[in-house]
Amino acid sequence: DTYIYPLLRGREVSRFSASPSPGSCVVVPQTGMFGDEQLPATSPQLFQFLARFKDTLETRSSYRRFQRGKPFWSIWTVGEYTFAPYKVVWKEMSGSNFVAAYVGSERMPDGTEKTVVPDHKVYFIPVQTEPEAAYLTAFLNSSSVSGAIGAYASALSLGTSVVDYFKIPKFDANDERMAELSEMGKRFSSGVVPTADNEQRLDELVARIVCGT
């Protein structure tokens, strides 16, 4: 169905690894701030299903506060970023263990490839390319950065502002340091386990990128 996407939950996120459980999906009945008004015509079965919960859906605080008068199937915090080709993700923290990964698309039961949508307890940075996603993932997973985030987790807003907070330079494929960091992020995300030397190299590259050396 047009409005069904693979769902990524926090427990499915680990260091350099994130993948939705088989069959885990979510309904996203819109592409912008409000529910798609064409849904009853384009997906009548889905509309009939959602209509069974109309009263409950209309009592949601986010709906009553921000979307009153809009289709009752509207959900909050949906925009272009929701459907970005790649997302750098990390789960809501309950302790000091910060880890990041990135996701792209997953194959649905009908054979189509659809972008992964994180649930409300997974923070993410939307990006357009895999090299940039791999770069950011490696940057965040370096011991210096992940340790700092973990140490100050209670004082930080761990949304996309983490990029600004740590002044993460924008990815430039022509920068050899960033390109190497990106390749490392991609390699470790494919299942290769980082060695002690790899971990040291991650920290070295991050330090050079931040300091401009």
Task: Report residues per predicted region.
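Non-catalytic DNA-recognition/assembly elements of restriction-modification systems
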Residues: Q45, F166-T213
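Polybasic, glycine- and aromatic-enriched phosphate-binding surface used to engage nucleic acids
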Residues: D1-R177
